C-alpha cells in the first residue's frame, strides 16, 4: 500500500486462484502489502509474521513457520520480489525464525491495475482477531484460520458482479468455490457464517 494513504490491500486474482501457493497465500500477501515501506521493501521475521497473523510460531518440519517460508519461496519464483533472501536455504536450514530479513517488492505485481479483491484494513483487523470478535457467538471456530477467511473474502471480492444499476453480488456454488481456491465446501460454509457476523 503505497504512501500508507490507502486503507486497503489489493489481492491479485492470480494469487487468489493459485492453489499451489497453499491456503496461506492471501494472509502473507496481505502482510507484505500492509508492511510495505515507502521504498517498496518489507523487513520481517517469520516469528513476527506468525504474531501478526495471531498464530504461535513453530519452526518444526511442516509447521507454520515452514509453511510461510514455502509461500514466500513460491512468490519469489513467480517474480513477486525484485530481491529476497534464499528462502529455499531458509527452509532447509530451519532458519532462526526471529531473524529479520528483507524483500524488495516487484511493484508491477503488487500495484495491480485490475482483477483483484480488496480487503480493507478494518476488515483485515477483524479477521485477524476473529476469535475475539466472535467470542460468545454460537459459531463453530474449531480448526478455523484467519488465512481461510481472508482467502474466501478475497475470492468473493474478485468475483463480485459489477453491473451498473444492480446490487453487488457474488453468485457461486460452494463446490465451484472449493474447486477454484482449494478450501473444502464444509469450511466455505463455516466461513460464510463467520463473514455474515462481520
Language model segments and positions:
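Winged helix-turn-helix DNA-binding recognition segment
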Residues: 34-95, 158-198
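Detector for short helical micro-motifs
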Residues: 18-41, 47-50, 139-165
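Intrinsically disordered, low-complexity regions enriched in small/polar residues
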Residues: 10, 19, 31-33, 46, ...
Amino acid at each position: 500500500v503505497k504512501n500508507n494513504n490507502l486503507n486497503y490491500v489489493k489481492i491479485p486474482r492470480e494469487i487468489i486462484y493459485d492453489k499451489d501457493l497453499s491456503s496461506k497465500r492471501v494472509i502473507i500477501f496481505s502482510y507484505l502489502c500492509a508492511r510495505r515501506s515507502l521504498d517498496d521493501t518489507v523487513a520481517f521475521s517469520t516469528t513476527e509474521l506468525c504474531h501478526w497473523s495471531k498464530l504461535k510460531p513453530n519452526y518444526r518440519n511442516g509447521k507454520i513457520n515452514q509453511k510461510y517460508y514455502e509461500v514466500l519461496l513460491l512468490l519469489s519464483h513467480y517474480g513477486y520480489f525484485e530481491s529476497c533472501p534464499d528462502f529455499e536455504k531458509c527452509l532447509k536450514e530451519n532458519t532462526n525464525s526471529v531473524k529479520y530479513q528483507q524483500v524488495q517488492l516487484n511493484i508491477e505485481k503488487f500495484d495491480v491495475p485490475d482483477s483483484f479483491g480488496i480487503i480493507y484494513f478494518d476488515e483485515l483487523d477483524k479477521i485477524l482477531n476473529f476469535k475475539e470478535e466472535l467470542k460468545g457467538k454460537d459459531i463453530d471456530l474449531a480448526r478455523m484460520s484467519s488465512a481461510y477467511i481472508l482467502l474466501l473474502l478475497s475470492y468473493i471480492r474478485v468475483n463480485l458482479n459489477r453491473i451498473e444499476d444492480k446490487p453487488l453480488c457474488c453468485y457461486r456454488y460452494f463446490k465451484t468455490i472449493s474447486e477454484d481456491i482449494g478450501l473444502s465446501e464444509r469450511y466455505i460454509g463455516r466461513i460464510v457464517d463467520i463473514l455474515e457476523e462481520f
